[in-house]
Amino acid sequence: MAKKKTIPQYTSVERKGIQYYRTRILDADGKQVSLYATTCEELYEKQLAARRQVQEILFHRQHPTVAEYCEKWLVMQSAKVSAATLKGYASNMRNYVIKPMGDMYMEEVTADDIRLALVPLSKKSEGLYNKVNMLIKCVFYSAERSQLLEDNPCAGISGKGGKPAQKKEALSDQQVVVLLETIKGLPPYLFVMIGLYAGLRREEALALQWDCVFLDVPTPYISVRRAWRAEHNRPVISTVLKTKAARRDIPIPKCLADCLREAKATSTSDYVIADSEGQPLSYSQFKRVWQYIVVRSTKERTYYKYVNGQSIKYTVKPTLGTSQKNNPRIVYTLDFEVTPHQLRHTYITNLLYAGVDPKTVQYLAGHENSKTTMDIYAKVKYNKPEELFDVVNQALHPSGTADNAAG
């Protein structure tokens, strides 16, 4: 015969003229919480439900799932990283960590589980693979330091994977001439000039204001003091730069100084590059500006047309020198691709080709790590075998060696 449950006797209190029964329990944080009900039976059920809830919370604190701990880790990072960086973390975490492992308890995850989660990323870019790999390791090492794990499954996970990115070459002198002639008088012209002849990052160029452009001095220069970023497609200008080294003063050549003077004479905005209302560009506005370059290239395009209710895919490869059918004013004059970062890469490469000291180039480029500059330097200096032949020949067969050996 089932044992009849015993209902405890509770203290009765009066609240707003109504008689209640009351008891107190400790919540998951150790704080005392009062529970009320009009009958002892109802209060007893409330008490049991509250205790189960507290036990569940305490269990999950000691044994969180991957999804729960990832969310907690992101909250902890929010005090240290920018909103844009945190958004990137959250997106990668959601798609590549929580999706395959989110329902597992942290202590259940094995090295094989992590390797399986990384398999789809092996087909993605090397950069994305490295980011997700870093996030997984940060999460599990954090849990280990918090004594939630006895063994860290990340200990033997390799950091290498993904498809290596195709490195963009610097634009040649001829390509620079063609590019500038193509977009002369168009919206991206000033941005391109700043990238080619001052080497500013995109976020630095879009945040540049006239109070940081010094043209009426013996040596015209640009002072990098602000950075642009987009949050929900809206521009946010900040004095927080990418690194400490990004804060720099860059002397500019006459061609860029003249271009900036011409732009300043007609500008009604505080920003060097602004929209029609004088405000900094949003992310979508910048994409539209850059599209002036893309539509003039011979890059292969894909279109979709609806025929009899079906979507038909068309691939078109424009011919150099021809005009766009729907807009004859657009001529395909660029037989090479251009990216915003490529402008900066061209600036750095040209400085190194001109023999500028790598340490000076590091300062002008705003590189915090000299390795970044030296990697470009090595490529510029040592990627031409015909120019290195005499050096290598001299090193391996110094003058007089053969004669001395014969003697």
Briefly describe each language-model feature range.
Residues 107-108, 149-151, 162-181, 223-225, ...:
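DNA breakage-rejoining catalytic core of tyrosine-based enzymes
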Residues 1-2, 217-218, 230-232, 236-247, ...:
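C-terminal secondary-structure termini that scaffold catalytic or DNA-interacting sites
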Residues 33-35, 62, 74-148, 165-167, ...:
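N-terminal core-binding DNA-recognition domain of tyrosine site-specific recombinases/integrases
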Residues 1-38:
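Short, Arg/Lys-rich segments that mark the N-terminal edge of DNA/RNA- and chromatin-recognition modules
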Residues 126, 181, 185, 198, ...:
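Short, basic (Lys/Arg/His-rich) helix/loop patches that form interaction surfaces
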Residues 108-111, 141-163, 314-326, 390:
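Short, charged hinge/linker segments at domain and secondary-structure junctions
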Residues 126, 130-132, 145, 149-151, ...:
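Basic, Lys/Arg- and aromatic-enriched nucleic-acid-binding interface segment
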Residues 170, 365-390:
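Catalytic-site neighborhood detector that most strongly recognizes the C-terminal catalytic loop/helix
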